[in-house]
UniProtKB/Swiss-Prot annotation:
Its EC number is 2.3.1.275. It comes from Cereibacter sphaeroides (strain ATCC 17025 / ATH 2.4.3) (Rhodobacter sphaeroides). Coiled coil: none annotated. This is Glycerol-3-phosphate acyltransferase. GO terms for molecular function: acyl-phosphate glycerol-3-phosphate acyltransferase activity. The gene is plsY. Keywords: Cell inner membrane, Cell membrane, Lipid biosynthesis, Lipid metabolism, Membrane, Phospholipid biosynthesis, Phospholipid metabolism, Transferase, Transmembrane, Transmembrane helix. The chain crosses the membrane at residues 10-30, 59-79, 87-107, 116-136, 161-181.
């Protein structure tokens, strides 16, 4: 963790801003804008880009991915520019929490992977890029989005230490633990060999998850 040098009020304000940005449910907004219905009633019911992809609409899934990662990155960049590095890490954490527990959806949100990657890219782009490449490499081999997410999250702290960003390690560990908790059902299905693979549409995924 960086040294806490900013004032309490500044940290509170950037933390709240990060949470509010993170809590914007772009997956729901995008699917409705594309006329795809309520994302919470599609596939797994998750509000993230992977579930949007289950509609078969790749542009909508890409837009969701970019916006979910972008909101985390923007929260970090605003906090860093306005306050400092301690506020930037706080905003990364609160924007991530906002995606997981959005006030607008009764605190029932997504799993946070895109927002996690967005915050890392903004905090230290080499670490963020390394985690993105870890996700892509795992996805190319396994074709399982959740496994790719878990590998990216687990590798985050390792990349932070290897790339000279040890001051981010505590944050990276907390975010990784939360991602694993949010993926507990996916972990069970991975162990059972029943986790759906990337590219399957909603009807296929629902039958696989029943």
């Amino acid at each position: 963790m960086p040294a806490i040098e900013s004032g309490l009020l500044a940290l509170i304000l950037t933390g709240v801003l990060g949470y509010l940005l993170g809590s914007i449910p772009f997956g729901i907004v995008i699917t409705r804008a594309f006329g795809l219905g309520d994302l919470r009633r599609i596939g797994s019911g998750n509000i993230g880009a992977t579930n949007v992809l289950r509609t078969g609409n790749r542009p909508a899934a890409l837009a969701t991915l970019l916006l979910d990662s972008g909101k985390g990155a923007i929260a970090v960049l605003i906090a860093r520019a306005a306050v400092g590095e301690d506020a930037a890490q706080l905003a990364a954490f609160t924007s991530f929490l906002g995606h997981l527990y959005p006030v607008w959806l009764g605190f029932r949100g997504g799993k946070g992977v895109a927002t996690f990657l967005g915050t890392l890219i903004a905090l230290a782009w080499p670490v963020g890029l390394a985690c993105c490449l870890t996700w892509l490499a795992t996805a190319a081999v396994s074709r399982i989005s959740s496994l790719s997410a878990l590998m990216a999250a687990a590798s985050g702290v390792v990349w932070m230490l290897l790339l000279g960003q040890g001051q981010m390690a505590a944050l990276g560990l907390v975010l990784a633990v939360l991602i694993f908790i949010r993926h507990h059902e996916n972990i069970r299905r991975i162990a059972n060999g029943t986790e759906p693979r990337i590219g399957k549409k909603a009807s296929q995924d629902q039958s696989a998850e029943q």
